[in-house]
């Protein structure tokens, strides 16, 4: 998966989607946000009772699906400078770049997301 988008739009989507994420769950994928890059970028949070999906305008260069821990992903994006965020993943290893900042985090298999 590879895409780029504005930091402010991504941060707002993460904040909205995180409202439906379980802070502690027996299913680890429920502590994360499902990212789906296709014709657009979709972020989904779900806690077995409530689900929230947001769509972010993004330049999708490579389609894919991945789950990232909501808290860590949100903290990273919040601390990025106001610029274009570039996101690239391969085999669940995610690289997030924005300005002079760069982070590498591990995602999880989207098949585990309900």
Please annotate each region the language model reported:
Residues 1-114:
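Structural preference for solvent-exposed beta-strand-turn elements
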């Amino acid at each position: 998966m590879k895409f780029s988008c504005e930091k402010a739009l991504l941060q707002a989507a993460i904040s909205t989607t995180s409202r439906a994420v379980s802070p502690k769950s027996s299913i680890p994928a429920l502590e994360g946000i499902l990212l789906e890059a296709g014709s657009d970028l979709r972020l989904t949070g779900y806690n077995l009772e409530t689900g929230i999906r947001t769509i972010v305008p993004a330049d999708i260069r490579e389609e894919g699906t991945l789950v990232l821990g909501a808290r860590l992903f949100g903290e990273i994006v919040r601390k990025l400078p106001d610029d274009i965020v570039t996101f690239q993943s391969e085999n669940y290893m995610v690289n997030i770049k924005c300005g002079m900042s760069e982070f590498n985090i591990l995602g999880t298999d989207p098949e585990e997301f309900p």
